[in-house]
């Protein structure tokens, strides 16, 4: 079976082609209810539609750019636009309508933009200020703005009501056939036996169908609500906005035309808009148009489209068009209907259901044929003249109903749906544990993870950074909480240079918030440096206003430094500042400021002193940054790059980023669970090693290597080196990508990778599970990731792994349980039909059994919470079989036991219990049915553990399991004792009840004994 499944029902956890997804669906030939079976599979037609939309967008944008360029050449000769403001827009106080705004940005219409007075003109017409943003003082004006220009939300499919799920559950082909059987049974029964005696069989089937439908619909409806809640969490995106004169964080769904949005590397453009100011802005439009070539956005080409990504630079943007008025809104509405890819387990279990369904269908046909043949043989024995009565018709109908119900029981439609149920349950619980699963498959894949490649900053450490040591002007000092002593020790000219560098060469900002308090905005590293500047007496706004910024090169993981070129107020001199990785920036310096504040050549002795200082700081687990400047003598153009060499070193700062509490224990837990943790960081190797030792990642037999050294290795050297690598420092994004790819392809590892920046995208994409940071992560990283770690904590990653293992094992438990029921129900009814000419389990009884094993069984077993024992096992890995030898052992062992018990009852039951009289067969069949159900109840308990003997451990922690077992027993008593007329049962004696329970219970020690058999 496994080889057939691997060749036909094997999909990747990520990036499966549409052809592969189509293939397995076409192989699912025995499907009772396609609407329900394929509800949680991707809608491929909607994906094709979205791809076509991207191609259309690409062509429209290409034409718009060409037209815009042509128009720009003749713009001075064109007469003013005859655009007229609609009356309702004018009455609301605005001078431009939403359609006109949309046509300007979407059409890249430079001509129209010019006619409306450029970006400043449009800002005025929208009653907004480029500096202060929107004013929302008047609620009426705000609601008018929303009414005229729309809100920044995309069209979503309506929440389906409970009755829709009831209707879908009724689409089950076998239930429909049984419904027809029930209807015919009612007609024939009433015609022959009268009302109400003749209606019992038919009404029994109808009641069973309705019960199955409502229980199924309730389960599906609850799942849909869980997925809806998770979907809302996925869409929570915030941006930095200036509104009412204050910079603040705001949900993208609250944005309105006229808002001023601040964008930086890794952000997603939240609406259509226009560039106000900024530097080196490069936009990736591939998500909208499919075009891979990045676009430079400047004052000359100011158009920013919703859904595109900031690849480089930073800027302020004026929002012009929102929501469904943008091309991104229309694309997202289509894509949301495309759905998630199916998970590998869902597809594999669809394969299992198909195989067993075909077997079950064959058994059902043969069973029906044998039962009908038996009936004909009885007729023949009565003589050549046949007489067909209403009872004969009812008997034939009952045979057909039994055959159909065998298909109901034999086609384990619940297998793939149990995966969805388990994943929905796990994802909901993981949200409480600060992990947001974006793709279903990631949850189950994480259970197989063998390696975690983790960032250092913010994941293993707290990301609360402070400068604790410095070496300014060759003078090493501890930085106290109040830096007055440091300030007095720095020469005045050097202090001025230092503050100029800190406040101009930064991606952060110091603002006054709505409460009138000073607030630092930016990354933790930027915040630490800005705090140092403020403590040294610097004033952010004064410094920024006194210099004119000419060029900014933001920090990225490849260069490992950032730079700025400014024009000084005195004499228009040009100065460049840079800061970044100490070794890299120091290598770009040829001069240094000494303790007297003089600029002197950087000789060997000074270089040695500074390198020793860097190593000392790093060995104390401090992140080190080197700060440097240079005066540019000749003229400098914004089109030029910032010089690479010739800088003067001002100093080095050591930033403390403490290790998170509990990380060492989590790393040790991973090691015991067979998961190798590797640190991949851009930091200095000594800093990385110190932190790695503190976390327990770097062991005596492990290797710490620098990225530049790693990338020089050939394939043969890598094969020997990679298994031992525990720390990679000074790594570039491509080093990370190479390591992940080698681990996956060469060493067959299942790799989870953390990332927070735009440059982590290749590694996140390549990994089996991409983990993005919720706090420090950029929108680009979050969008490409499979799981978002909301608290940026490594311990949460371990929790995700635990939940992943729990999902995988829970599904295995359910599959083991359901296949046991399938095998026994099939063989019992088939063999009984062949040997005795009758079936001991009726259609109504089989429907009840089907509900026990399908919906209720999935609820009980697929929602088991994880326990600590899960992290003491080795991971399944990439090549592990889903249906293991241990599972087959348990399935076949239990099936044989149950089959023997039922056959003993069929053969010797009447004599064992002294059953005589006309109702002896009914009592015996009721006893067989009762024993069969209790075998399933106790087997469900035994299935809680596939290898362990103690199946009661933690049973009370899973209240769903307890409720399901209790409800099953309760309704079984009701069916036997009170619903005999409809279920073809009769009340049992106390001895017969105890016997049924004992037979079921006896399956537990047998299950325990089976677990002792090695496989």
UniProtKB/Swiss-Prot annotation:
Q: Which residues lie on this side of the membrane: Cytoplasmic?
A: 1-161, 222-349, 418-811, 863-882, 940-957, 1012-1015
Subcellular location, principal: membrane
Gene for this chain: ACA7
What is stated about domains? The N-terminus contains an autoinhibitory calmodulin-binding domain, which binds calmodulin in a calcium-dependent fashion.
PROSITE patterns recorded for this chain? Answer: ATPASE_E1_E2
Q: Which UniProt keywords apply?
A: Acetylation, ATP-binding, Calcium, Calcium transport, Calmodulin-binding, Ion transport, Magnesium, Membrane, Metal-binding, Nucleotide-binding, Phosphoprotein, Translocase, Transmembrane, Transmembrane helix, Transport
Write down which residues bear the modification named Phosphoserine: 45
Pfam families to which the protein is assigned, alphabetical:
CaATP_NAI, Cation_ATPase, Cation_ATPase_C, Cation_ATPase_N, E1-E2_ATPase, Hydrolase
Q: Which GO terms describe its molecular function?
A: ATP binding; ATP hydrolysis activity; calmodulin binding; metal ion binding; P-type calcium transporter activity
What family does this belong to?
A: Belongs to the cation transport ATPase (P-type) (TC 3.A.3) family. Type IIB subfamily.
* Entry protein name: Putative calcium-transporting ATPase 7, plasma membrane-type
The alphabetized list of GO BP terms reads: pollen development
Tell me how this protein sits in the membrane. Answer: Multi-pass membrane protein
Q: How is its activity regulated?
A: Activated by calmodulin.
Provide the binding site for Mg(2+): 756, 760
Q: Catalysed reaction per UniProt? A: Ca(2+)(in) + ATP + H2O = Ca(2+)(out) + ADP + phosphate + H(+)
Instruction: List every position bearing N-acetylmethionine.
Output: 1
Active-site residues, record numbering mapped to chain? 455 (4-aspartylphosphate intermediate)
Q: Where in the cell is it found?
A: Membrane
* Region called Interaction with calmodulin, residue ranges: 20-31
Role noted for this protein: This magnesium-dependent enzyme catalyzes the hydrolysis of ATP coupled with the translocation of calcium from the cytosol out of the cell or into organelles.
Q: What is its EC number?
A: 7.2.2.10
Enumerate the transmembrane spans.
162-182, 201-221, 350-369, 400-417, 812-830, 842-862, 883-905, 918-939, 958-979, 990-1011
| GO terms for cellular component | plasma membrane
Q: Which residues lie on this side of the membrane: Lumenal?
A: 183-200, 370-399, 831-841, 906-917, 980-989
